Amino acid sequence: MKFSIVISTYKRDDGKTPELLKRTLDSVFNQTYKDFKLFLIGDKYEDVNEIFEIISKYDSEKFYFENLSYAKERDRYKNSNKMALWSYGGVNAINYGIIKSINDGYNLICHLDHDDWWYPNHLEEIKKCIEETNASWVCTKSTYFSEYVFLPKKITNKEYENFLPESGGLIHSSVCMDFKKIPLLYRDVYDLTNTIGLPADADLWERTREYIQNNNLKSYFINKLTCRHDEEGYSRN
């Protein structure tokens, strides 16, 4: 079983990208399960030498990096629509990494924000869950804002199996999807409707839930804490 890990990154206005990205990458390469490839996509990262300096420290055979020549959402929204930027910034880069992963033969894809990180057992727990349940979509327990343990909405002991994603109900860095079985990408809802709807990840979970139900697929919540997202990395820049 092999995993693709997709990370999109950009040069933050607060200058914290190098330290946060290094923490994220360290967490990936410290995984106990090693059969993965990381696809890092620069969303028009302005100082590419800064990125090369960071990634030079990691195993190049497990690493793919590409810097896009344009940042579709940030170029469009940064000076005109901050809410659209926060909701949909990086969608094009994330989707680019997903499609690149699929074209390279990966179907189990994990999305990891460049300021989130995993505990060493994250991929191992997902692998075991998929082997035991044949789930097409899984997520793990996360922490969010000062060690707050984040559980999906309305979770009970009886809902671990066939747990369905929903908007606002999970941290997307805790999710792994089989994109061969669930061929859905992130969307810029504002670009489609000219209104601020659900953020890109929440929109994807709503569509994913419907797809899982309509196609009788299996989904699962892993009741183990393996993913971190907190205020240190939080930014709308």
Predicted regions and their residues:
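Short beta-strand-to-loop acidic/aromatic patch adjacent to the donor-nucleotide binding site
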Residues: Y106-D115
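A recurrent flexible, glycine/aromatic-enriched loop bordering the glycosyltransferase active site
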Residues: Y88, K158-C176
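Short beta-strand/loop segment that forms part of the nucleotide-sugar
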Residues: F36-Y45, E66-Y70
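Short, acidic, metal-binding catalytic loop of nucleotide-sugar glycosyltransferases
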Residues: R23-D35
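Conserved donor NDP-sugar-binding/catalytic core segment of glycosyltransferases
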Residues: E124-P152
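Active-site-proximal specificity loops/subdomain of glycosyltransferases
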Residues: I51, Y58-S101
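Active-site donor/metal-binding and catalytic loop motifs
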Residues: T143-L151, Y220-N237
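Acidic donor-binding loop at a coil-to-helix junction in glycosyltransferase catalytic cores
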Residues: T195-L204
